[in-house]
A protein has these predicted regions:
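Conserved adenine-nucleotide phosphate-binding loops and their immediately adjacent elements
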Residues: 215-228
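Accessory nucleic-acid engagement/destabilization modules that flank
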Residues: 1-212
Length: 228
């Protein structure tokens, strides 16, 4: 389940986004008996407007947006899933978006999977390309319509405050061949990715319903990992 579900058009109408963030906070308290940290709330306040603006400017007001979508059998949450219909095939189509506010990042000890970020000291973080690829793989493994290729699934790491130069090392990750990493420098590219996956003239409610109501069918390896 997502902490907040809304059409892109409705999400844009919430600007300023205080009420949306308040709803997400209430849902988290209701479902998990805990409040998001101040840092997480600040993250929502900075990233949700950027995503909403780009969806609006891309002409995708009919798309359905799932914010903080929880993955099955884990507490991990996907920042956003944009749901709709693929413009070429007519099949359900989903864009998993990992939103980052970082302005710069570099590899940690030449390891493409780990990065250092300004303001976090020497505490390495996972490369967002690896993160979004893992989310897509996990989601597909638990969702038959995705694993059986009845629907489209694409992942994007969107560093909307960064420049290409400031995060150039991150593209050395092998997942750069299959996942997208987009910075604020390439906002047009991000919108083009969205338009290539989501039909602007079709409402995304059906695709979102299909994903949210899908039967969870975890593979044996994932069950073993969860048990461990």
């Amino acid at each position: 389940m997502a902490l907040l579900r809304a059409s892109a058009q409705r999400l844009a109408a919430w600007n300023p986004f205080d009420s949306a963030i308040e709803q997400m906070t209430e849902q988290m308290l209701y479902r998990h008996l805990s409040r998001p940290s101040p840092a997480e709330q600040r993250s929502w306040a900075r990233s949700i407007p950027a995503l909403s603006r780009d969806l609006a400017d891309a002409g995708l007001g009919n798309a359905e947006v799932l914010l903080e979508q929880q993955l099955p059998l884990t507490s991990r949450r996907i920042d956003a899933i944009v749901a709709g219909t693929h413009p070429k095939t007519g099949r359900p189509s989903y864009v998993v978006v990992e939103l980052k506010q970082w302005s710069s990042a570099e590899l940690f000890e030449d390891n493409p999977s780990l990065i250092l970020i300004d303001g976090y000291g020497r505490d390495p973080r996972i490369n967002p390309l690896e993160q979004v690829a893992g989310y897509c793989e996990y989601l597909a493994d638990f969702t038959p319509i995705l694993s059986d290729q009845q629907a489209h699934l694409t992942g994007v790491a969107y560093l909307h405050n960064a420049t290409d130069f400031a995060v150039r090392d991150l593209r050395e990750h092998p997942e750069a061949a299959s996942m997208h990493l987009v910075t604020g420098d390439r906002r047009d590219e991000f919108m083009n990715i969205l338009r290539s996956q989501i039909d602007p003239d079709t409402r995304g409610t059906g695709a979102a319903d299909l994903l949210l109501n899908a039967r969870e069918a975890p593979s044996k390896p994932l069950l073993k990992v969860a048990a461990d």
